[in-house]
């Protein structure tokens, strides 16, 4: 707090927040890391040791390169720094290699790349409406947003304990959003195009970008009622946008097109042979669907409606990533999830087209695209919830309704990440960090909107408080029961299903809010 006090007086409070979280990241260096640590070490080795023609074919390790080319080049650049730390980490055949120098290099590379995220957060803070400015520094929307983003619990544990490089990728996304708020549309489009070629999961929010840029940049004027003035369409602008996307894509995919390897690259990026859900079900609609199928199958067996010999052998809770058949409900195909996702996204896209509401409307649409894809996508990872939580953070300091949705989404979504850290030493760390972040989020947003109605109703409060007993049950009670051996998947099942309820509720509540705002806007115009 001393650093923050000094920073308040000099106006450098943002630097103090950034420095503080960086020190925390350094303290987390010795903690547990997941298999993703080996994944990225292997990618360093592949890009450093092999010619580009072999990058997307190399399969010595099961952790093959399955990110777009820009990320592969990023690993290539890192590898030329890594060789000064430990040359052995760059050997393709050194599977599961993890020396102390390798650990330090990979951990510090994540921390260093977060510089882009810090800069993007600063740019986003410049876009925040300053109407609700409190007397105290800690009550200012910009300060609250800075803490919500820089100290985001999910990003901390996923990148700096579990191990991934999400920080600088989200930095690109937030910087792109900031540029659109600043009406620097070409820069925003360029940054997002670059981002897509770093990690293709951001395709989930591409519809929001495409529609917003077409509606608000390529059409230069509206009619008095807010509808499109078709004659204002600018061919120059749409060609400029197309050229930006084309050039970025050509730079990324061009070398592999020249090598006639695009089919191989895309087969790595989109492995549809994986199952509907990850080993640990992401808390989405399909988790509820799978749970219902399990319940119906148990009831069917008890009532002898089902033949035990006809029950599929592949278990959805076995911890294996595989395809499986549902027992009672219809099995779900990749095409079915795509259709469900498109149907879920369309209403928000229509609202953005017919009632743009400026950059804020774009941001709400982007969040809904991210959430809808999380809810209905194929083989969704639990970490993908951050794609909705981070942009929702920007909305949370603007309106009380959005703050309420954000708190439900972020608390539930962050808790759903707990199974990523399953080792005993990390248990107190994840509980303490989440408690601190959650308490701060709720208290700061309640203070910001203290003149408005309470952020939670009794049902929402009861649900969020239920996460406490759930954690006690899963971590401290279940391990001492006889069910631990026979039903080891129950804690994961309970966590996934319970969190799926909260995330589904937040998604539905945000959708209702967007549709109502759109309808009210049309009524006012009339």
Swiss-Prot record:
Implicated disorder: Congenital disorder of glycosylation 1H: A form of congenital disorder of glycosylation, a multisystem disorder caused by a defect in glycoprotein biosynthesis and characterized by under-glycosylated serum glycoproteins. Congenital disorders of glycosylation result in a wide variety of clinical features, such as defects in the nervous system development, psychomotor retardation, dysmorphic features, hypotonia, coagulation disorders, and immunodeficiency.
Substrates-to-products reaction catalysed: an alpha-D-Glc-(1->3)-alpha-D-Man-(1->2)-alpha-D-Man-(1->2)-alpha-D-Man-(1->3)-[alpha-D-Man-(1->2)-alpha-D-Man-(1->3)-[alpha-D-Man-(1->2)-alpha-D-Man-(1->6)]-alpha-D-Man-(1->6)]-beta-D-Man-(1->4)-beta-D-GlcNAc-(1->4)-alpha-D-GlcNAc-diphospho-di-trans,poly-cis-dolichol + a di-trans,poly-cis-dolichyl beta-D-glucosyl phosphate = an alpha-D-Glc-(1->3)-alpha-D-Glc-(1->3)-alpha-D-Man-(1->2)-alpha-D-Man-(1->2)-alpha-D-Man-(1->3)-[alpha-D-Man-(1->2)-alpha-D-Man-(1->3)-[alpha-D-Man-(1->2)-alpha-D-Man-(1->6)]-alpha-D-Man-(1->6)]-beta-D-Man-(1->4)-beta-D-GlcNAc-(1->4)-alpha-D-GlcNAc-diphospho-di-trans,poly-cis-dolichol + a di-trans,poly-cis-dolichyl phosphate + H(+)
Source species taxonomy: Eukaryota, Metazoa, Chordata, Craniata, Vertebrata
Annotated pathway: Protein modification; protein glycosylation
Task performed by this protein: Dolichyl pyrophosphate Glc1Man9GlcNAc2 alpha-1,3-glucosyltransferase that operates in the biosynthetic pathway of dolichol-linked oligosaccharides, the glycan precursors employed in protein asparagine (N)-glycosylation. The assembly of dolichol-linked oligosaccharides begins on the cytosolic side of the endoplasmic reticulum membrane and finishes in its lumen. The sequential addition of sugars to dolichol pyrophosphate produces dolichol-linked oligosaccharides containing fourteen sugars, including two GlcNAcs, nine mannoses and three glucoses.
EC annotation from Swiss-Prot or TrEMBL: 2.4.1.265
Membrane-crossing residue ranges in chain numbering: 4-24, 103-122, 143-163, 188-208, 238-258, 334-354, 368-388, 389-409, 427-449, 461-481, 488-508
Xref: InterPro entries: Glyco_trans_ALG6/ALG8
Name of the protein in question: Dolichyl pyrophosphate Glc1Man9GlcNAc2 alpha-1,3-glucosyltransferase
Top EC class for this record: transferase
Top-level taxonomic group: Eukaryota
Record's subcellular location: Endoplasmic reticulum membrane
GO BP, sorted A to Z: dolichol-linked oligosaccharide biosynthetic process; protein N-linked glycosylation; protein N-linked glycosylation via asparagine
CC per GO annotation: endoplasmic reticulum membrane; lumenal side of endoplasmic reticulum membrane
Sequence similarity: Belongs to the ALG6/ALG8 glucosyltransferase family.
Membrane topology field: Multi-pass membrane protein
Pfam families linked to this entry: Alg6_Alg8
Protein keywords: Congenital disorder of glycosylation, Disease variant, Endoplasmic reticulum, Glycosyltransferase, Membrane, Transferase, Transmembrane, Transmembrane helix
Organism: Homo sapiens
Molecular function (Gene Ontology), one example: dolichyl pyrophosphate Glc1Man9GlcNAc2 alpha-1,3-glucosyltransferase activity
